[in-house]
């Protein structure tokens, strides 16, 4: 099993829209997939740090959700470094619907981390 966390603008789960930045997104969609990339479980978690957060708070929260992977459109270099220290894979460059983004990640179309000028 792998736990993939996706930054979302809303609480619609896989039918929702990806957020533009992982740290200030209002929600995270937490998806557990099996070895065949089949979705086993989906849940939605509110981001307690959406309005304000200090260094490392959001990566620590995402890690506490059991994340093996965080998928977001963009992320700052400091956050990428935090996730690296926590052992969470970062995949950036996603846009559009959460479910389509998840499938793109599972298909290998989204991978690796490119830092943005944000936090």
Regions found by a protein language model. Name each.
Residues 1-53, 57, 65, 85, ...:
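Non-catalytic interface/targeting segments
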Residues 59-91:
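Mid-chain, well-packed structural core segment of small domains
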């Amino acid at each position: 099993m792998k736990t993939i966390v996706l930054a979302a603008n809303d609480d619609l789960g896989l039918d929702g829209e990806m957020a533009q930045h992982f740290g200030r997104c209002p929600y995270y969609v937490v998806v557990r997939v099996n070895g065949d990339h089949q979705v086993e479980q989906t849940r939605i978690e509110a981001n307690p740090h959406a309005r304000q957060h200090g260094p490392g708070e959001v990566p620590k929260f995402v890690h506490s959700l059991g994340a093996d992977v965080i998928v977001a459109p963009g992320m700052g270099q400091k956050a990428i470094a935090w996730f690296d220290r926590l052992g969470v894979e970062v995949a950036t460059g996603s846009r559009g619907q959460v479910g389509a983004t998840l499938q793109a990640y599972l298909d290998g179309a989204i991978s690796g981390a490119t830092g943005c000028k944000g936090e």
